Amino acid sequence: MGNRGMEELIPLVNKLQDAFSSIGQSCHLDLPQIAVVGGQSAGKSSVLENFVGRDFLPRGSGIVTRRPLILQLIFSKTEYAEFLHCKSRKFTDFEEVRQEIEAETDRVTGTNKGISPVPINLRIYSPHVLNLTLIDLPGITKVPVGDQPQDIEYQIKDMILQFISRESSLILAVTPANMDLANSDALKLAKEVDPQGLRTIGVITKLDLMDEGTDARDVLENKLLPLRRGYIGVVNRSQKDIEGKKDIRTALAAERKFFLSHPAYRHIADRMGTPHLQKTLNQQLTNHIRESLPALRSKLQSQLLSLEKEVEEYKNFRPDDPTRKTKALLQMVQQFGVDFEKRIEGSGDQVDTLELSGGARINRIFHERFPFELVKMEFDEKDLRREISYAIKNIHGVRTGLFTPDLAFEAIVKKQVVKLKEPCLKCVDLVIQELINTVRQCTSKLSSYPRLREETERIVTTYIREREGRTKDQILLLIDIEQSYINTNHEDFIGFANAQQRSTQLNKKRAVPNQVIRRGWLTINNISLMKGGSKEYWFVLTAESLSWYKDEEEKEKKYMLPLDNLKIRDVEKGFMSNKHVFAIFNTEQRNVYKDLRQIELACDSQEDVDSWKASFLRAGVYPEKDQAENEDGAQENTFSMDPQLERQVETIRNLVDSYVAIINKSIRDLMPKTIMHLMINNTKAFIHYELLAYLYSSADQSSLMEESADQAQRRDDMLRMYHALKEALNIIGDISTSTVSTPVPPPVDDTWIQNTSSHSPTPQRRPVSSVHPPGRPPAVRGPTPGPPLIPVPVGPASFSAPPIPSRPGPHPGVFANNDPFSAPPQIPSRPARIPPGIPPGVPSRRPPAAPSRPTIIRPAEPSLLD
């Protein structure tokens, strides 16, 4: 059978096919195989049974094969059969194989003669077969029988096309010799998907059932109706032989005797019969597999790469590894710690571009949300002045004070410091929420183990809650420390002298007018209601104005809105809107923009809204509700202050403002540090060094690594497929590159398959061969049946000769030209006819003057050259 490495290619495909069929991936890989196509009663079952040497396929009238049968023939010293759907059972009785095929077919298709594209996988081991992989497809039928659906013809054709359309499949087109070959549905379907004829092999059956006096010699020699890969003739058992229990091996011997003894086929007997068909198919399949290996390897590598992402944490061990659970637990806990640290600290690899990570969100809390909460408590100007005036008066009592009391300053400062507790504790709560969300995101990879995920989240969350208490205690301690001693000697404190000088300026300190506080996209909800809805603009917020532009290039300014008398109010989110909205309005009831009393600005998230509010606060635009409270307080303090008290209030006001700014600066600096040290860093250390111990102490390993049935099945299938892919790639990589392929035959003119109307009803019937003069096409003159003058050896030129047109039945005739050199090359290497009296051992070549032998039809007819 040639190179041993080439023969091992076909078992390789069988191994790959089983590996992927077991996990439902067989149809996704175009594994090289041979598809057997033919009409009903064309002899497909007999051909397949001759391969195996056993009777095992269902037989009967009508459509019998209703599901594709993937038949893998494997050379083995022992003979048995295996089905993929019941691998544990070996069939040694082939009658049971037939019954199992029928039962498995009925299990899927029912008993109403329906069909199904789901294949039946059957492997047959035998010392009498070559390594072949074939697919037996349902026979082509025209008319439904019994309960078959009306579109049974189209269903079968669709199923056949589904298998033979693959570029990696060879097509075995089976046609009986007693049927019109030009109208063969098998060849037509093969031509439809394989117009070049590279994948089609013709098989002619029932040669022994042709009408007396006719033969298929021209067809088998690939001269009359040529195919690129030619035809192979076989002789199967008749129904009488099958009923008479004629042994297949005996039938193969009878087939061999038929070709050796038949006058029309004996010169090509070595290229006919089931054994030669086996060898030819094995050779063609081996060549095809070798050509398909690069694409197959590429597909396997592509699937392996996509699968590696899913089994990253499991790829180093197999499902049957006894230490798999321990390895998985250790690896998952370690990976959880790495993922948590990356989400908090940030990482350059696998950066999420869709949303902010936990660390980025915590950073926004530290530097945007927390300062925003601090700024909100700084603007209560009227309440602060009222409290200062009350403190001064209460300290003086019945006396009239001449100097500004420093006790009033300390009392007001301590009261302001106490107000820092609320935003500080709120900051801790926000960070805790982000930490818990980060933990849940990192445990998503543990979804295969619900118990492990639940315990991990519980243990880490409990630890975070424990650190929450210590962190809040430490922050309250910091505030108490600030409150315990007022350090008026601080280098940043303005002192009484500077406070009195600054009191004459009436606190006119403002930001730099042209300083840009924030830029970004915002949607104006109510500016284009009459023009089709909201519109997005590029906004620029400075210390004095709010401007918006068409785009971020800031070339086309739409409008500039001064910040004087502007306030912010919250707007309820619309029922059908995903945006978060806040509004800007004028406190003096003036239109803000054109005829609008307020402008509604929308953001994608509440975080963006809070960030924009903090920016407006820095620009001096405050929320509405706080301003309303201030106005209520102002109504209660309509009393007039004397000039001396007013100067004292202003002085203490400036002192308080200066000292509170120092405290705020200190708190803004210490809050992130305290939270990082006591909560975040400790949580990271706990996950790395203590989480595993807590997991082992909370439950045993078996309960932690329990999987749901679906998750376990999916995981095992994924790992099995991953290792099957790696094994397949390793096997393909070991194939010898020195394998020599059999060259593909040259192209032939096979247009006869499409244009069948120009041929006779029985094109394969050949009474006597005819020879045409050189240089003249067959269509110039009618055919002149008769024996050839000189047999010409087989040569490549026989494939390049123009196809001989079909001709009517036999009739006597003579050649117009008897020049032996004028005839084109012929396929046979010996005379086509032997007289009855000449024994089989007569030499195959005779001189031109020798008398020609009569044909089978006219055995007594003398040669014209006598």
Swiss-Prot record:
Pfam families: Dynamin_M, Dynamin_N, GED, PH
Region described as Disordered: 737-866
Region annotation G2 motif: where it falls in the sequence: 64-66
Biased composition, class Pro residues, residue ranges: 784-794, 802-811, 822-851
Compartments, record wording: Cytoplasm, Cytoskeleton; Cytoplasmic vesicle, Clathrin-coated vesicle; Cell projection, Uropodium; Endosome
UniProt: GDP binding residues: S41, G43, K44, S45, S46, R59, G60, K206, D208, D211, N236, R237, Q239
Record-annotated PH domain positions: 515-621
Keywords: Acetylation, Cell junction, Cell projection, Coated pit, Cytoplasm, Cytoplasmic vesicle, Cytoskeleton, Endocytosis, Endosome, GTP-binding, Hydrolase, Membrane, Microtubule, Motor protein, Nucleotide-binding, Phagocytosis, Phosphoprotein, Synapse, Synaptosome
Family: Belongs to the TRAFAC class dynamin-like GTPase superfamily. Dynamin/Fzo/YdjA family.
Modified residues (Phosphothreonine): T751
Post-translational note: Phosphorylation at Ser-844 by GSK3-alpha relieves the inhibition of BIN1 and promotes endocytosis. Phosphorylation at Ser-760 by CDK1 is greatly increased upon mitotic entry. It regulates cytokinesis downstream of calcineurin, and does not affect clathrin-mediated endocytosis. Dephosphorylated by calcineurin/PP2 during cytokinesis in a Ca(2+)- and calmodulin-dependent manner. Phosphorylated on tyrosine residues by EGFR and after activation of SRC.
Positions of post-translational Phosphoserine modification: S760
Subunit structure, as described in the record: Oligomerizes into a helical polymer that self-assembles around the vesicle membrane, when associated to the menbrane through lipid binding. Interacts with SHANK1 and SHANK2. Interacts with SNX9. Interacts (via C-terminal proline-rich domain (PRD)) with SNX18 (via SH3 domain); this interaction regulates ATG9A and ATG16L1 trafficking from recycling endosomes to sites of autophagosome formation. Interacts with SNX33 (via SH3 domain). Interacts with MYO1E (via SH3 domain). Interacts with PSTPIP1 (via SH3 domain). Interacts with CTNND2.
Region: G5 motif, residue numbers: 235-238
Modified-residue entries (N6-acetyllysine), positions: K299, K594
Superkingdom of the organism of origin: Eukaryota
InterPro entries per record: Dynamin, Dynamin_GTPase, Dynamin_GTPase_CS, Dynamin_N, Dynamin_stalk, G_DYNAMIN_dom, GED, GED_dom
Modification sites for Phosphotyrosine: Y231, Y593
Region (G1 motif): 38-45
Name of protein: Dynamin-2
Skewed-composition ranges (Polar residues): 752-763
GO BP, sorted A to Z: actin filament bundle organization; autophagy; centrosome cycle; membrane tubulation; neuron projection morphogenesis; phagocytosis; protein polymerization; receptor internalization
Reactions it catalyzes: GTP + H2O = GDP + phosphate + H(+)
Dynamin-type G domain boundaries: 28-294
Topology versus the membrane: Peripheral membrane protein
